[in-house]
A protein has these predicted regions:
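Individual transmembrane alpha-helices with interfacial aromatic-anchor signatures
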Residues: 143-160
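Conserved small/polar residues in nucleotide/adenosyl-binding loops
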Residues: 169-175
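Interfacial aromatic-anchored transmembrane helix boundaries in multi-pass membrane proteins
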Residues: 31-48, 73-102, 136-141, 145-146
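Short helix-perturbing small/polar motifs within transmembrane alpha-helices
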Residues: 20-24, 29, 70, 91-124, ...
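Generic transmembrane alpha-helix motif of multi-pass integral membrane proteins
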Residues: 50-64, 101-106
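Alpha-helical transmembrane segments and their lipid-water interface positions
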Residues: 38, 129-133, 160, 164
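Residue-level signature of transmembrane alpha-helical entry/exit and packing/kink sites
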Residues: 12-20, 48, 52, 87, ...
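Hydrophobic transmembrane alpha-helices
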Residues: 2-58
Length: 179
């Protein structure tokens, strides 16, 4: 007798794929909604980055691999949905380096310091995006923009790092870690 598809794939795999799908949908929804909000400051490129809450959530409560998948899907689909394919180079570079930084930091920092890892990740994210912009435009002077981006990264990174444990209490997903 042939096994059902659920038994062939495995219950844990189905739950994992479902969790990744749900979190990707949440991240994309947040991304689209945030793109409709007018800039909070008159400095180009500064935004809240609220969809990063979902990636950091996945990193902490699911796995680095799941966070990576969600990040890739969100950034790729977000650039397609927004019609800004060029955004992919900036967002993917910044997002991947941010995720890698947070993965390393979270191996050594207690979960209560998630906000600190998020701030450092946000600074790395912004630095990577400016580096990509400098390479693409051949304009090294763009690095003079960094002090503003670092201030923004400290504020948004802290908010995102503090929002993840709060969001955990409102989501029911199979996770690998407790708050």
């Amino acid at each position: 007798m042939k096994k059902s598809p659920e038994k062939q794939i495995g219950h844990k795999t189905i739950r994992r794929i479902t969790s990744i799908g749900i979190l990707t949908a949440i991240a994309l929804t947040i991304f689209v909604l945030e793109s409709q909000i007018p800039p909070l400051v008159a400095i180009p490129g500064i935004k809240l980055g609220l969809a990063n809450i979902v990636t950091l959530f996945a990193l902490v409560f699911l796995s680095p691999t799941d966070a990576f998948i969600i990040l890739i899907l969100r950034v790729t689909m977000g650039s397609v949905f927004s019609g800004q394919i060029m955004m992919l180079a900036y967002s993917l570079t910044g997002g991947l380096l941010c995720l890698l930084t947070e993965m390393i930091l979270l191996k050594y920092l207690p979960l209560k310091n998630l906000w600190a890892a998020s701030i450092i990740g946000a600074i790395i994210h912004n630095t990577a995006q400016v580096a990509v912009a400098a390479l693409i435009t051949q304009t090294p002077g763009i690095f003079w923009y960094m002090p503003y981006l670092i201030i923004a990264a400290i504020i948004t990174g802290a908010f995102i790092g503090l929002a993840v444990p709060v969001s955990y209490t409102h989501l029911t997903l199979p996770t690998n870690r407790e708050v």
